[in-house]
Amino acid sequence: MATSAGGGGTTTGGMRSTGGETAAGGSLATGGVGATGGITSAGGTKATGGTVSAGGTTTGGASGGHVGSGGTTGAAGASGAGVKTTAGNGPCDIFAAGSTPCVAAHSTVRALLGAYNGSLYQVTRASDKTTKDIGVLSPGGFANSATQDTFCTGTTCTISIIYDQSGKNNHLKQAPAGQRKATPDNLADATALKFTMSGHTVYGVHLPVGYGYRVDQTTGIATADQPETEYMVTSGTFYNGSCCFDYGNAETDNHDDGAGTMEAVYFGNWTSQGKGAGNGPWVMADMENGVYAQASFAANPNDPPLTSPYVTAMVIGRSGSFALMGGNAQTGTLTSFYDGVRPNGYNPMKKQGAIILGIGGDNTATAQGDFYEGVLTSGAASAATAQAVQANIVAAGYGN
């Protein structure tokens, strides 16, 4: 988004929910699936030392809980009705099965494909400026955080690259100067967001004001009016009311190039343009020159605050229409907050295909948030595919 930062106080805690959020009056996406208890990665790939692959759903859903080495289970998951998945799959396997393959996949906490065995991210050590790639414990598994801990002992480290797992080489690096902020953005402290997933210690990406990542020259990302699906797992307890904590499709020149030149997932409680119900934070779509909760800047009563520690936020972009979905990344299914026409002046879209994280398309860097995982796909995912991805996220065991 390219307008100047709006008002709104920073919220850094104290807004946790104890269950999944549903939109007041909002309908669950058709083709979606209900909560079935928990999800086990039944038959997930087991690594040396008893590590189970991160997340994974079975055909028709699975029961139980996804078990990590500590025996923690993910509660209240969902089944992916109509989408064929197999144990050990990641979100990108599920999107591919739904004919909407990932063209970018970023995470510092886990592999997003069942067979992925490469590096998740790179850290740079402050003491001598050397770098280290951080991989996974096993194919399709969690980050090998012990590698980072050893490398960064006695000094500090920043996350210098978040690697693209899709094979398209759309790696996120330090965001360069842009129209709104004429200097590069800061890189995240590699140890600032430590937590556990299914008993494994991992590190997310903590992005205070002034921090951000970007890649302008990409391969396979949607341009013009091409359809796409984008989601990120973020935090409902660390956000603010400024522009713009985004993940997704943006301008390639780091400037505001007008309405429709972006399509990114926004999360926060900025109210200068669109907004949802209550005080936020909300899932919205940043389409440049406008952050929208529906087809106008009017408040959308069906877009509720999502205040759980881990939030799934999704935007589905089609020719002439877009959809917003979201939910608790620890439990339950996604809820549809909006599915309808684009705002006036946004048809057709003029997407350019860069990827941003934590900032606006013109490098506005006054927002804040946390990032754990996210993807961009080629094509608009079905509701059933979206729900199967959510089930996989729940199964990964965020915070367990």
PLM region spans:
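Ser/Thr-rich, Pro/Gly/Ala-heavy low-complexity intrinsically disordered linkers and tails
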Residues: M1-A87
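GGW-centered surface loops in extracellular recognition modules
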Residues: K84-A182, A224, Y231, I393-N400
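Short hydrophobic/aromatic patches on beta-strands that form ligand-binding or substrate-lining surfaces
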Residues: S99, D164, E230-G236, A313, ...
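Short, hydrophobic/proline-enriched secondary-structure or compact coil segments at domain edges
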Residues: A115-K129, Y203-V205, M232, P281-V283, ...
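Extracellular glycan-recognition modules
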Residues: I159, G167-T307, S319-S321, T331-N344, ...
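Long, repeat-rich segments with strong aromatic
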Residues: Y310-S319, L324-G327
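Extracellular glycan-interaction patches encoded by glycine-rich segments
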Residues: N347-F371, A380
